[in-house]
């Protein structure tokens, strides 16, 4: 998939204001009385009060100051082959659509993650928390476990949930992210491919499917996406929101009608941050070492990063 971008000037710092619902309480209106100033001093005082009133109308409450390096570090997470393949498997964007990914970024900011804490495991923890907050379908988010924890995910997922709770505590339990906040985050680099992950209407809403015989969740990296009768095969490959250089998108596309049982090479999972939170012996799985020489850097084709890598004026 090609991702074209128009060159545009973007400031190195963006401030996103978040309105608080508590500020919208209804208060009785005071009667307005107009008094004509009787002297010059009174007129100057009147102008000063008017200026102060205009200042008070500016947005109040918490805000996010987004630096260029913050967005760059977040986008670099999607260089990870495993995360790319996870997005490819989520072909219907039910686990990681653009709004859930924007919430993940906001969690990173609220938690004040350093650049070194922009890691794979923290990405999956934040994404799981976003699904917990927003999604009615509980079982779908469990697909994150085998991708984040590897083949031993059944033993490791209790610790994963503890890390989720620690992240929730670190953001002061402010897990709600408004739609406007998400859209302002996406507007910083609107043509980046992760913001093209639009979920279809038929996958939205609080509609449960009680027929659990069709798909057993979670399925993990060793399986291919399930055919979706609602999205259709064409939609599944056109709107993945994934770089065309992903090895899975090119290798597995030809065998999508069968479930691949190829073994994946286990890798040690990097957890950068608090060493006390690191897993011991946990594994993640992928099948990319055989294609290592064939992979290309998708950022060379994705021009949406140009304003991040360019020199600041």
Swiss-Prot record:
Q: Where is this region: Speedy/Ringo box?
A: 68-200
Tissue and organ expression note: Highly expressed in testis. Expressed at a low level in wide range of tissues including bone marrow, brain, heart, kidney, colon, liver, placenta, spleen, skeletal muscle, salivary gland, thyroid gland, thymus, trachea and uterus. Expressed at a slightly higher level in adrenal gland, cerebellum, small intestine, lung, prostate and trachea. Expression is cell cycle-dependent, being restricted to cells in G1/S phase.
Pfam family of the protein (one) = Spy1
Q: Which domain of life is it from?
A: Eukaryota
Where is region (Disordered) located? 278-313
Give GO terms for biological process.
DNA damage response; establishment of protein localization to telomere; G1/S transition of mitotic cell cycle; male meiotic nuclear division; meiotic attachment of telomere to nuclear envelope; oogenesis; positive regulation of cell population proliferation; positive regulation of protein kinase activity
For this UniProt record, the keywords arranged alphabetically read as follows: Cell cycle, Developmental protein, DNA damage, Nucleus, Phosphoprotein
Q: Does the keyword Cell cycle apply?
A: yes
GO MF annotations for this entry?
protein kinase activator activity; protein kinase binding
Annotated positions of the Phosphoserine modification = 222
From the Swiss-Prot or TrEMBL record, state where the protein is found. Answer: Nucleus
GO cellular component terms, A-Z? chromosome, telomeric region; nuclear envelope; nucleoplasm; nucleus; XY body
User: Could you tell me which InterPro entries the record lists for this protein?
Assistant: Speedy (IPR020984), Speedy-Ringo_regulator (IPR052316)
- Locate the Phosphothreonine modifications and list their residues: 224
Q: Give the domain section of the comments.
A: The C-terminus is required for CDK2-activation, but not CDK2-binding.
Q: What family does the Swiss-Prot or TrEMBL record give for this protein?
A: Belongs to the Speedy/Ringo family.
What this chain does, per the entry, is described as: Regulates the G1/S phase transition of the cell cycle by binding and activating CDK1 and CDK2. Contributes to CDK2 activation without promoting CDK2 phosphorylation, by inducing a conformation change of the CDK2 T-loop that obstructs the substrate-binding cleft prior to kinase activation. Mediates cell survival during the DNA damage process through activation of CDK2.
Q: How does it assemble?
A: Interacts with CDK1. Interacts with CDK2. May interact with CDKN1B/KIP1. Identified in a complex with CDK2 and CDKN1B/KIP1, where it interacts primarily with CDK2.
Q: What is this protein called?
A: Speedy protein A
Q: Which organism is it from?
A: Homo sapiens (Human)
Tell me what gene encodes this.
Answer: SPDYA
């Amino acid at each position: 998939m090609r991702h074209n971008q128009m060159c545009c000037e973007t400031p190195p710092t963006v401030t996103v204001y978040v309105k608080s619902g508590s500020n919208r309480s209804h208060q009785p209106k005071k009667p307005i009385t107009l008094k004509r100033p009787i002297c010059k001093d009174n007129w100057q005082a009147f102008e000063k009060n008017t200026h102060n009133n205009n200042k008070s109308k500016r947005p109040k409450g918490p805000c996010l100051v987004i630096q260029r390096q913050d967005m760059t570090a977040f986008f670099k997470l999607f260089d990870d082959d495993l995360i790319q393949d996870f997005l490819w498997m989520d072909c219907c964007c039910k686990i990681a659509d653009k709004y859930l990914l924007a919430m993940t970024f906001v969690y990173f900011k609220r938690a004040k993650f350093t650049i070194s804490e922009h890691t794979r495991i923290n990405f999956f923890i934040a994404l799981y928390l976003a699904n917990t907050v927003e999604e009615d379908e509980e079982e779908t988010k469990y697909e994150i476990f085998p991708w984040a924890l590897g083949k031993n995910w059944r033993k490791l997922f209790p610790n994963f949930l503890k890390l989720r709770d620690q992240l929730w505590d670190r953001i002061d339990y402010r897990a709600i992210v408004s739609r406007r906040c998400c859209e302002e985050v996406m507007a910083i680099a609107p043509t980046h491919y992760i913001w093209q992950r639009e979920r279809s209407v038929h996958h939205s809403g609080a509609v449960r499917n009680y027929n659990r015989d069709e798909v057993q969740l979670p399925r993990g990296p060793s399986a291919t996406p399930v055919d979706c009768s609602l999205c259709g095969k064409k939609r599944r490959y056109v709107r993945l929101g994934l770089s065309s250089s992903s090895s899975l998108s090119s290798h597995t596309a030809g065998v999508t009608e069968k479930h691949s049982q190829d073994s994946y090479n286990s890798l040690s999972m990097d957890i950068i941050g608090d060493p006390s939170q690191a897993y011991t012996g946990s594994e993640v799985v992928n099948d990319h070492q055989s294609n290592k020489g064939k992979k290309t850097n998708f950022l060379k084709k994705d021009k949406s990063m140009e304003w991040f890598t360019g020199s600041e004026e």
